[in-house]
Amino acid sequence: MSTLITNIAELMTQDAEHRVLKDAAVVIEGERISWIGPSSAAPAADDEVDAGGRALLPGWVDSHTHLIFAGDRTAEFEARMAGESYSAGGIAVTTGATRGTSDFDLTRLALGRVAEAVSQGTTYLETKTGYGLDVENETRSARIASTVADEVTYLGAHLVPAGADADEYTDLVCGPMLAAVRPYVSWADVFCEQGAFNEQQSRRVLQACKDAGMGLRVHGNQLGEGPGVRLAVEFGAASVDHVNYLSAADVEALAGSWSGWQGAGTRGTVATCLPACDLSTRQPLAPGRELLDAGVPIALASNCNPGTSYTSSMAFCVTTAVLQMRLSVHEAVRAATYGGALALRREAGNDVDGERAVGSVAIGHRADLHLLNAPSATHLAYRPGIPLTHAVWRAGVRAR
């Protein structure tokens, strides 16, 4: 089955040449993109969709979410809005609610959140464990996550449970818990922050998970300067997320991890910015402009979670990046598409063949497409808060 999407006013490919095509057309063949070019030269297809002069983008790639949970934390949110500062302790509230919820209901809730994200243009997403915090419930979360998300990350090292010894809990994370979740996950993460896991504990988690053959990610530098960025670069993590508080040495280390990379070769560590979380916690926005200017690739992600960023709107993140972080529209869209793919090692090139590539529109790539109800992507920031998703294709299937 083939589908021709024609009369596209603006096609932001996010391919290697960063091409933006005008009056364009795209052909989907099965799950893949089979043709791109001018509307006037478009081939026939089994089905035809008139884009009506709208803009077409790659689907959003949301590389940082926490979707496996029950309950909410509205009381914590209200307290924070009243002036209380954010700390990681609220994670325990969600852990209690999640442990008390059945597999069926956890799956139902997670699927609802995925559907909400897809309806807004997200076509590829990662999610984490981290609200189980014991072997049984982390394994349960990992298993459920593997049925609802494209990429699953083990975050047993999210918070030390109340009453537990931090080093003994780290032993558990690196031993029995890791062994139990491993069949369901491909990534591992650690919350390297004051009040969560210190440098020594974080190093142990990263080493154990690396030895288990997992890709690495780090929650780092959210609440203050610390060792998170340095550890992420040292261990070759795919991304370090939050990055609100960076020293000059942190920025230099991130930039240095990409030295010599020109779309091929050894990748460095992506800096993943989470602007919706920054606004909700009233933290300084991550320095996306400064990172880009220093040569550090960035990703934008929703950090959808019940405590600090209960949104799946990648468009909101793009809008915030443009209006508050001083990114151009093109830079923000790229960070929310290709940048997310790079943070998940799913960008085209290197060891990723075209059929596995996401975050860009190119022949042979997965047909993840987001049609806006606007003539250009500029409208995402120009008309903030307006729902502009008109149609979505996920792996070639019309999802909206």
Swiss-Prot record:
The Gene Ontology biological process annotation of the record reads: L-histidine catabolic process to glutamate and formamide; L-histidine catabolic process to glutamate and formate
Q: Name one GO cellular component term.
A: cytoplasm
Top EC group:
hydrolase
Compartments, record wording = Cytoplasm
Annotated positions binding N-formimidoyl-L-glutamate: 131, 305, 307
- Pathway it acts in? Amino-acid degradation; L-histidine degradation into L-glutamate; N-formimidoyl-L-glutamate from L-histidine: step 3/3
Q: What is its EC number?
A: 3.5.2.7
Q: Which reaction does it catalyse?
A: 4-imidazolone-5-propanoate + H2O = N-formimidoyl-L-glutamate
> Which InterPro entries does the entry link to?
HutI, Metal-dep_hydrolase_composite, Metal_Hydrolase
Q: Give the molecular function GO annotations.
A: imidazolonepropionase activity; iron ion binding; zinc ion binding
The residues listed in the UniProt record as binding Zn(2+), with positions renumbered to this chain, are 64, 66, 219
Task: State the needed cofactors, names only.
Answer: Zn(2+); Fe(3+)
* Entry keywords, A to Z: Cytoplasm, Histidine metabolism, Hydrolase, Iron, Metal-binding, Zinc
Give the top-rank taxon of the lineage listed in the UniProt record for this protein: Bacteria
Q: Note how many cofactor molecules are bound and how.
A: Binds 1 zinc or iron ion per subunit.
Name the positions where Fe(3+) binds. 64, 66, 219
Residues annotated as binding 4-imidazolone-5-propanoate are 73, 131, 158, 222, 308
What's this protein's function?
A: Catalyzes the hydrolytic cleavage of the carbon-nitrogen bond in imidazolone-5-propanoate to yield N-formimidoyl-L-glutamate. It is the third step in the universal histidine degradation pathway.
Q: Which family does it belong to?
A: Belongs to the metallo-dependent hydrolases superfamily. HutI family.
Q: What is this protein called?
A: Imidazolonepropionase
Which species does this protein come from? Arthrobacter sp. (strain FB24)
